[in-house]
Amino acid sequence: MAIHTCFSLIPSSFSSPKLPYPKNTTFQSPIPKLSRPTFMFDRKGSFQNGTAAVPAVGEDFPIDYADWLPKRDPNDRRRAGILLHPTSFPGPYGIGDLGPQAFKFLDWLHLAGCSLWQVLPLVPPGKRGNEDGSPYSGQDANCGNTLLISLEELVDDGLLKMEELPEPLPTDRVNYSTISEIKDPLITKAAKRLLSSEGELKDQLENFRRDPNISSWLEDAAYFAAIDNSVNTISWYDWPEPLKNRHLAALEEVYQSEKDFIDIFIAQQFLFQRQWKKVRDYARSKGISIMGDMPIYVGYHSADVWANKKQFLLNRKGFPLIVSGVPPDAFSETGQLWGSPLYDWKAMEKDGFSWWVRRIQRATDLFDEFRIDHFRGFAGFWAVPSEEKIAILGRWKVGPGKPLFDAILQAVGKINIIAEDLGVITEDVVQLRKSIEAPGMAVLQFAFGSDAENPHLPHNHEQNQVVYTGTHDNDTIRGWWDTLPQEEKSNVLKYLSNIEEEEISRGLIEGAVSSVARIAIIPMQDVLGLGSDSRMNIPATQFGNWSWRIPSSTSFDNLDAEAKKLRDILATYGRL
């Protein structure tokens, strides 16, 4: 509404009459000349003028008072992003990587108006049994997945020759064993050339190796990998006792016999780190924040456990006393038995949670913000005796709670974490999350099976929250819709203002983006409207997961129309 002063109503021809004033009276203009004091808000929201408080009732504000508009807190900015793991990029060598397609994807995100890119854990994926390709069963909590190293980038660095690159492998599914056979020898060759070279790149490698934040985990990881490569056993539990228990003389012998392997391992980690930094720097130049993902637990057969046995609940021989899992939930009637060793939280607290401080520091080196998977485990965790075969036989135990995050805050500073608070969420989990001001999660696919009180429905969302159409553990929107009971379908269509079934992917995306939650995340499969065959993971199943890729026939250059459609939705709901 336009605001006019009273003087705008006086005709220009109007002549003010002369009014008689008493003698000996000092004339005062009815409109005194205004000074322009500097006002500001203090932390409590009151006006301050130097040492003066709010002007007295009836006094004049400065003439620019109408320009004192409220300013939005930058932390309240509404954002949107895409969930897409780098392995899912299209590309010529059977797996997405940190090469040209990563930069094209960031260009696409920028075109779409997105300011977030969420990835799954970047750790080396599991290789044993049903772990094949799983970033949540990683071999090390801090190392990077070297299969993500781009061969084209190695050519640009002069570490590979163009004629050494393999023939294109056009496949829409990642076969991790096949890809390892193709890429590992070439990445090893590049690492050897780097080690034998001189110049700036070699100097960067040496600086990487000497960095205390890197060496705190890198040396243990390298020794572990070297022993694992030379000793043919299922886990470190079966290693010869001097190696199993890290006797100094045994480790010195490993260094002498496996020095080349250790040096190559470290060089490969450097190459991963270097390529990831280039991708992250480019993301920043586009105004895009990268959100990582951190599993709460680590695998038993890992340098994390081998080098830090006192931080885990192991028996005297080094075998887990109890292991991780969750009780029965929407994904499994008997619960999920994850099998990871559990932390000895009492021992960790005694040394200031140093293991977790180092892990969080590493995450901040890789990501702008990150999700912690199974956040509820910090309040209370499900513990299953290691001899049991099903998770339902476990019991709840008290977690570390706020003292852990106090120690992290003191050592690392403020961190931007997202608390994955799905599943069985008790009041202590809610209070812990709120005490550290971490946003929780809502998933629209969980919203329509009950009543209006369902916390996943958009009208029940909170501002400090991240809303997903679905996560990596959910089906795609199209696949979810195809198997949804008719009653739930009716609920969805009614809630989304009677959209057509053909528009269900767009409808649910709009449902997420229109939420009051500050952050909305959409899996790339949903942007493309894909079905169940493009699902990333089916919880509690053993095979066929983590392999989906954007079809090799598709390029981000050909997805401008999808980007513009998404941008229109984001603009409508204030997320640009």
Swiss-Prot record:
Keyword hit for Transit peptide: yes
SUPFAM superfamilies, per database record: (Trans)glycosidases (SSF51445)
Residue runs in coiled coils: none
Cited Gene3D superfamilies: Glycosidases
Gene Ontology annotations for the cellular component aspect, listed alphabetically: amyloplast; chloroplast
Tissue: Present in leaves, stems, roots, and stolons but is most abundant in developing and mature tubers.
Isomerase found in the keyword field: no
Stored Pfam families: Glyco_hydro_77 (PF02446)
Reactions catalysed, as given in the entry: Transfers a segment of a (1->4)-alpha-D-glucan to a new position in an acceptor, which may be glucose or a (1->4)-alpha-D-glucan
EC number, UniProt record: 2.4.1.25
InterPro entries reported for this sequence: Glyco_hydro_77, Glycoside_hydrolase_SF
Compartments, as annotated in UniProt: Plastid, Chloroplast; Plastid, Amyloplast
Keywords: Amyloplast, Carbohydrate metabolism, Chloroplast, Glycosyltransferase, Plastid, Transferase, Transit peptide
Role played: May act during starch breakdown to convert small oligosaccharides into larger molecules upon which starch phosphorylase can act, or may change the structure of starch molecules and grain architecture by modifying chain length, or may generate from starch and glucose oligosaccharides which can serve either as primers for new starch phosphoenzyme.
Family indicated by similarity: Belongs to the disproportionating enzyme family.
Protein name: 4-alpha-glucanotransferase, chloroplastic/amyloplastic
Taxonomic source organism: Solanum tuberosum (Potato)
